[in-house]
Amino acid sequence: MEDYKPFFEAIDELKEKSENGWVVVVEGKKDVRSLRAIGVSGEIVVFTGYASTADTLKDRKVIILTDSDAKGMEIEKGLVEALKTYGKIPDVEIKRKIFSNVRKEISKVEEISAFYEKISGIEL
């Protein structure tokens, strides 16, 4: 359990920021369900394209939480650039913290809730 302390801390940080008005951007509906299952209660937006997503979020504090794979990294990079045109610097560190020491077990946001349940012993 101690090995996963950074994972749990990152999840707690995500929940706290979400409760305080930060918008979480994910890749799909399964990602939304996974985050809701672990208690993320704030607004979650599904990525629809760089320009449209950035325009929707231009006046918000944003957390980009895409998968830790090539496609997710590509979306993250493009969305960071699109948000910069509005003078916004999104949070990508929570994603790094979540996936940093669990890459062997999970790489997708939709897998977070099942993994959380497995290692915490808490039924979601």
UniProtKB/Swiss-Prot annotation:
Keyword hit for Ribosomal protein: no
Gene Ontology molecular function: any one: metal ion binding
Domain Toprim: 21-98
Cofactor: Mg(2+)
Keyword match Metal-binding: yes
Binding site for Mg(2+) 2: 67, 69
InterPro entries: TOPRIM_dom, TOPRIM_RNase_M5-like, UPF0292
Cofactor detail note: Binds two Mg(2+) per subunit.
Pfam families in the record: Toprim (PF01751)
Keywords: Magnesium, Metal-binding
Binding residue positions for Mg(2+) 1: 27, 67
NCBIfam families: PRK04017.1-3
Family in the record: Belongs to the UPF0292 family.
Name listed for the protein in its UniProt record: UPF0292 protein AF_0905
Species: Archaeoglobus fulgidus (strain ATCC 49558 / DSM 4304 / JCM 9628 / NBRC 100126 / VC-16)
